[in-house]
Swiss-Prot record:
UniProt-listed CDD domains: GH31_MGAM_SI_GAA, GH31_N
Gene encoding the protein: agdC
Sugar-bearing residue positions: N171, N293, N373, N747, N879
GO biological process, one term: polysaccharide catabolic process
Cited function: Glucosidase involved in the degradation of cellulosic biomass. Has both alpha- and beta-glucosidase activity.
GO cellular-component term (any): extracellular region
Name this protein carries in UniProt: Probable alpha/beta-glucosidase agdC
Organism: Aspergillus clavatus (strain ATCC 1007 / CBS 513.65 / DSM 816 / NCTC 3887 / NRRL 1 / QM 1276 / 107)
Signal peptide span: 1-17
Record has Lipid biosynthesis as a keyword: no
Family of the protein in this entry: Belongs to the glycosyl hydrolase 31 family.
Pfam families registered for this protein in UniProt: Gal_mutarotas_2, Glyco_hydro_31_2nd, Glyco_hydro_31_3rd
Keyword set includes Glycoprotein: yes
Catalytic activity: Hydrolysis of terminal, non-reducing (1->4)-linked alpha-D-glucose residues with release of alpha-D-glucose; Hydrolysis of terminal, non-reducing beta-D-glucosyl residues with release of beta-D-glucose
Length: 887
């Protein structure tokens, strides 16, 4: 949400990193006492000369652990001999079993040089990672390690950022330090930290490198003076905890990463519907009016959201008694539920320091962050002076559960269906050192004044009497091991990362605070704050409704966040630049970071959108996994019904999205089971085609649907790249034979978007769309068969009850087409009354002589010469195998 009030705060320039942190004066380490096993290697590392102490104190004694964890994964860990240096807690990022591999069978090989110590990771004769060009630096507040790279490498990942999908390889610094970052600027640290990169080498394969370290860091990609390419880590602490993943293809590397970071959480069927929100809905009447307007405009609305407007003076776990009184909010939620729609609200981590239940309970249980002298740490956010939950506190889950059980009680509170968590980097408007949060809040009018109380301005048919106008006015500190070394400067480390907010404590929680429990420092765990809130919130939502999958959307993330939550891409702007970059952002999270429930604020959050941009964005946004229109209080309203062309675009977009919803649900489910990305950059599908490596303006929605959006103002055409394959136009059925070149697609109105089905695909779609996903799930299916260049095609369909956390039964179908024969087989664990009502075969030039169904005899078919397709009307059960011959 908008951070415009920050202009009143003192501005601090970004810290300037050292020009050459990896000084040749540092001696490096000497490896001794090397021991090798069938799947591991250990060694002692001893400082090889006089300490350089560039940005801290050199540690004299380190340990090396190498594990061949699987045939495709290698673990290399360099840590202090006494194990006092902070390591990412296993309670936050669980570790995988590392005992299943062997050195002989591993695709990845570890080689090292003893003095000065350096190491290589190789795949066959190919060097993937090589630290021999510089000496290892391991200090109490600074780590440095550099690997050489091939010339002009294809590198991806290292989020969160709004830079191109394929990373710049000259003079590029990617800083990982989570921060509130309105406008999501380029070349800047944003809300999340994902220290994993993918190096794609075309036909030679792909590999991934994950550094499990939550400390602030600069990752530099550049060339030496003599032109040699490198990637360099510069971290403020922690250890070197590397995981190397082999991948014959980019997909394989992503799958391997999922095995370490964790498989994504499966989402409910309804969560893939259309969501509407705005910061600035003044009261419950306006929220209800928006719901009504979508219905009248015949634009399907699945879920209505409310921003912090619903709160009493912006205090979490409260309702504004005048504008969002409990009885009206409960009536609103009841109305939505009766119409098969959902309701979601925002919860921030910061709790108002005032007389309210959230604060009083937290103080009583002692779960807020404290200074080292035991006094309450205070910041300033929307409600004014605030306290911050300590997610490491032993009683924090009890506290959080209690607030959820009370405020979100289905019987007496706000019965939400999902949760939106924001400001959890954690954000703090008051600039460090923030000695007077009370004075800052007064000076900056926190909390902001609420809008005037008003009666409902117009009737809302179908809503309770409370929502109607009055009759007269009717009108139309370290406690154990792996926690952190003592004596560090936790506020001003000598090495300063390139944090665009300035000092590392600027605009966030002070980094010298010590967490309860084990005694971790905020300095080390800052990047974990949002993910720990996500984990606690998921548990709190789950104990409210233990049987169903909780939808939780967060702003701040760390590696592994996808196991708990989805992510929206933050406070973007209503312009074409942010429209375009949303594609690369989405692909990074869904394909590379294993956070597949992801999307941008459609039509833009900050600034005024316009009709053309919003119409285009409605079509593009329908291919985001998380599909939500949202903007802020000072911008013009931008609900899809505000312009007729946008309304038309939205109706068309949602119709396609809903028809494809089960196709996407199937692919998304597969990712939660195997890690195989369901949303993919073009080079994931064509890994040997160099023309796809930098393409972040097109993407695959599942394995079968290629999306090629128009991406600039006043354009009705787009140059789209088509690899050497066969494609079918979604709307016309026209066959396009790709030649590994760009093709100009023309006459694309603002309500359309180019979509093509990749040859070799069988796409199961719903026979028609619907106004809600409950209604949609009652519709039958149609199979679209798009034969590949060899005349074959295949596809899958997964069905379950759409909501249960643990499925008692499911249906998994497999479709295979070859030489006019379609076979449908599967695992029929769940009974359904749904049928396959039609089969459409694309790329045909004439009507078939005969169509035979294995269980129903002959069937009628219809040839469409304009679409070059044959459609067969069927009544095939999904509960048994079937076979169809088309001759």
């Amino acid at each position: 949400m908008l951070r415009s009030l920050l202009l009143l705060a003192p501005m601090v320039g970004a810290a300037v990193a050292a020009t050459e942190p990896n000084s040749p004066a540092c001696p490096g380490y000497r490896a001794t006492n090397v021991r090798e096993g069938h799947n591991s290697l250990t060694a002692d590392l001893t400082l090889a000369g006089k300490p350089c102490n560039t940005y801290g104190t050199d540690l004299k004694n380190l340990k090396l652990l190498v594990e061949y964890q699987t045939d495709e994964r290698l673990h290399v860990k360099i840590y202090d001999a006494n194990e006092q240096v902070y390591q990412v807690p296993e309670s936050v990022v669980p570790r995988v079993d590392g005992k299943g591999g062997s050195r002989k069978k591993s695709v990845l090989k570890f080689n090292f040089k003893a003095n000065p110590f350096s190491f290589q990771v190789k795949r066959g004769r190919e060097v993937l990672f090589d630290t021999s060009g510089s000496n290892l630096v391991f200090q109490d507040q600074y780590l440095n390690l550099r690997t050489s790279l091939p010339r002009d490498p294809n590198l991806y990942g290292l989020g969160e950022h709004t830079d191109p999908l394929r990373l710049t390889t000259t003079n590029y610094t990617r800083t990982l330090w989570n921060r509130d970052s309105y406008g999501i600027p380029e070349n800047s640290n944003l809300y999340g930290s994902h220290p994993v990169y993918y190096d794609h080498r075309g036909e030679d394969g792909t590999h991934g490198v994950f550094l499990l370290n939550s400390n602030g860091m600069d990752i530099k990609i550049d060339k030496t003076k003599d032109g040699k390419q490198f990637l360099e880590y510069n971290a403020l602490g922690g250890i070197f905890d590397f995981y190397f993943f082999n991948g014959d293809t980019p997909k394989d590397a992503s799958i391997e990463y999922a095995k370490v970071a964790g498989l994504p959480a499966m989402q409910s069927y309804w969560s893939f519907g259309f969501h509407q929100c705005r910061y600035g809905y003044r009261d419950a009447f306006e929220v209800a009016e928006v719901v009504q307007n979508y219905t009248q405009a015949k634009i399907p609305l699945e879920t209505m959201w409310t921003d912090i407007d619903y709160m009493d003076r912006r205090r979490v776990f409260t309702l504004d008694p005048d504008r969002f009184p409990l009885e009206k909010v409960r009536e609103l939620v009841s109305y939505l539920h009766k119409h098969d729609q959902k309701y979601i609200v925002m919860v921030d981590p910061a709790v108002s320091v005032s007389d309210n239940k959230g604060f009083n309970d937290g103080m009583e249980q002692g779960v807020f962050m404290k200074h080292q002298n035991g006094s309450l740490y205070k910041g300033a956010v929307w409600p004014g002076v605030t306290a911050y939950p300590d997610w490491f506190h032993p009683d924090i889950q009890k506290y959080w559960d209690g607030q959820f059980n009370d405020f979100f009680s289905p019987e007496k509170g706000v019965d939400i269906d999902g949760l939106w968590i924001d400001m959890n980097e954690a954000a703090n408007f008051c600039t460090y050192p923030c000695l007077d949060p009370e004075g800052y809040s007064i000076e900056n009018n926190l909390p902001p004044a609420a809008p005037p109380v008003r009666p409902n301005p117009r009737p809302l048919p179908g809503f309770p009497d409370d929502f109607q106008p009055p009759a007269a006015s009717k009108r139309s500190v370290a406690k154990g091991s792996k926690v952190g070394l003592p004596g560090r400067d936790l506020l001003n480390p000598r090495y300063q990362i390139r944090n665009d907010a300035g000092l590392i404590s600027s605009k966030t929680i002070n980094t010298d605070l010590i967490h309860a429990g084990e005694g971790y420092a905020e300095y080390d765990t800052h990047n974990l704050y949002g993910t720990m809130m996500s984990s606690a919130s998921r548990q709190s939502m789950a104990q409210r409704r233990p049987a169903v999958r909780p939808l939780i959307i967060t702003r701040s993330t760390f590696a592994g966040a996808g196991t708990h939550v989805g992510h929206w891409l933050g406070d973007n702007l209503a312009d074409w630049k942010h429209y375009r970059i949303s594609i690369a952002q989405m692909l990074s999270f869904a394909s590379m970071f294993q956070v597949p429930m992801v999307g941008s604020d459609i039509c833009g959050f900050g600034g005024d959108t316009n009709e053309e941009l919003c119409a285009r964005w409605a079509r593009l946004g329908a291919f985001y996994p998380f599909f939500r229109n949202h903007n802020e209080i000072t911008s013009i309203p931008q609900e899809f019904y505000r312009w007729e062309s946008v309304a038309e675009s939205a109706r068309k977009a949602i119709e396609v999205r809903y028809k494809l919803l089960d196709y996407v649900y199937t692919a998304f489910h597969r990712q939660t089971q195997t890690g195989e990305p369901f949303l993919q950059p073009m080079f994931y599908m064509y890994p040997e085609d160099k023309n796809t490596f930098s393409n972040d303006m097109q993407f695959f929605y599942g394995d079968s649907i290629l999306v090629s959006p128009v991406h600039d103002v006043s354009q009705t055409s787009v140059e789209a790249y088509f690899p050497k394959d066969i494609f079918y136009d979604w709307n016309t059925g026209d066959v396009l034979r790709g030649r590994g070149a760009k093709v100009t697609l023309s006459n694309i109105s603002v309500t359309d978007i180019p979509i093509h089905i990749r040859g070799g695909s069988i796409v199961p779609i719903r026979s028609e769309s619907a106004m809600t996903t409950v209604e949609l799930r009652k519709k039958g299916f149609e199979l679209l068969i798009a034969p590949g260049q060899d005349g074959t095609a295949s596809g899958t369909l997964y069905l379950d009850d759409g909501d249960s956390l643990k499925q008692s039964a499911s249906l998994e179908l497999e479709f295979k087409y070859r030489k006019g024969n379609l076979q449908i087989k599967g695992k029929f664990g769940m009974h359904t009354d749904l049928k396959i009502n039609a089969i459409t075969l694309l790329g045909q030039t004439s009507v078939p002589r005969q169509v035979t169904l294995s269980r129903a005899g002959k069937a009628d078919s219809k040839f469409d010469p304009a679409r070059q397709s044959v459609t067969i009307k069927t009544d095939l059960s999904l509960n048994e195998s079937s076979e169809i011959d088309i001759n």
